[in-house]
């Protein structure tokens, strides 16, 4: 039976990659790693006005239950090992959103002796959300960009 015949019969055809990535994008569970004022905007995005639940985003308190980490705020040298430890406790696949100028590159405190100049020096970052602090809309846009990135990835390894 040709593909046209399958579609006429009411069947939907897809690849396993697209199906798995579709389910992953519809249920992103971020673990909040709020370090400074950007965390207030992150909480604002989760409240009723913006309602991240409509994107399938449900904040989780444990790294073992989450697949996205949102680093929001200034990362200090003393907090960097804790960030890496929490990241290592997350199950694969896992993604990181760096939220705000301080998390992206040190921000206002860039030249301070105690500030890590970007959380990408500690964990790999998938999406950067700029701003000081970024608005809730900017965080939502970053989550949408992460969903688009997940849809483009190959989930099942192909042997070539």
Curated annotation (Swiss-Prot):
It is found in: Cell inner membrane. It is an enzyme of class 7 (translocase). Keywords: 4Fe-4S, Cell inner membrane, Cell membrane, Iron, Iron-sulfur, Membrane, Metal-binding, NAD, Quinone, Translocase, Transport, Ubiquinone. Its EC number is 7.1.1.-. Its main location: membrane. Binds 1 [4Fe-4S] cluster. It is a peripheral membrane protein. Its cofactor is [4Fe-4S] cluster. One of its GO terms (cellular component) is plasma membrane. [4Fe-4S] cluster binds at residues 37-38, 102, 132. It catalyses: a quinone + NADH + 5 H(+)(in) = a quinol + NAD(+) + 4 H(+)(out). GO terms for biological process: aerobic respiration; electron transport coupled proton transport. GO terms for molecular function: 4 iron, 4 sulfur cluster binding; iron ion binding; NADH dehydrogenase (ubiquinone) activity; NADH:ubiquinone reductase (non-electrogenic) activity; quinone binding. InterPro entries: NADH_UbQ_OxRdtase-like_20kDa, NADH_UQ_OxRdtase_20Kd_su. Pfam families: Oxidored_q6. NDH-1 shuttles electrons from NADH, via FMN and iron-sulfur (Fe-S) centers, to quinones in the respiratory chain. Couples the redox reaction to proton translocation (for every two electrons transferred, four hydrogen ions are translocated across the cytoplasmic membrane), and thus conserves the redox energy in a proton gradient. NDH-1 is composed of 14 different subunits. Subunits NuoB, C, D, E, F, and G constitute the peripheral sector of the complex. Belongs to the complex I 20 kDa subunit family. This is NADH-quinone oxidoreductase subunit B. It comes from Ralstonia nicotianae (strain ATCC BAA-1114 / GMI1000) (Ralstonia solanacearum). The gene is nuoB.
């Amino acid at each position: 039976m040709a593909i046209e015949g399958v579609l006429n019969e009411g069947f939907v055809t897809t690849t396993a990659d697209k199906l798995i990535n579709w389910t992953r994008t519809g249920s992103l569970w971020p673990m909040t790693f709020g370090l400074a004022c950007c965390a207030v905007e992150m909480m604002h995005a989760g409240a009723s006005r913006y309602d991240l639940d409509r994107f399938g985003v449900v904040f989780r308190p444990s790294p073992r239950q989450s697949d996205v980490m949102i680093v929001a705020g200034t990362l200090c040298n003393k907090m960097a090992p804790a960030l890496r430890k929490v990241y290592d406790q997350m199950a694969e696949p896992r993604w990181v959103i760096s939220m705000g100028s301080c998390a992206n590159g040190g921000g206002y405190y860039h030249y301070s002796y105690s500030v890590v100049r970007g959380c990408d020096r500690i964990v790999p970052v998938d999406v950067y959300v700029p701003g000081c602090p970024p608005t809730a809309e900017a965080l939502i846009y970053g989550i949408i960009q992460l969903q688009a990135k997940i849809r483009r990835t190959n989930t099942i390894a192909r042997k070539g």
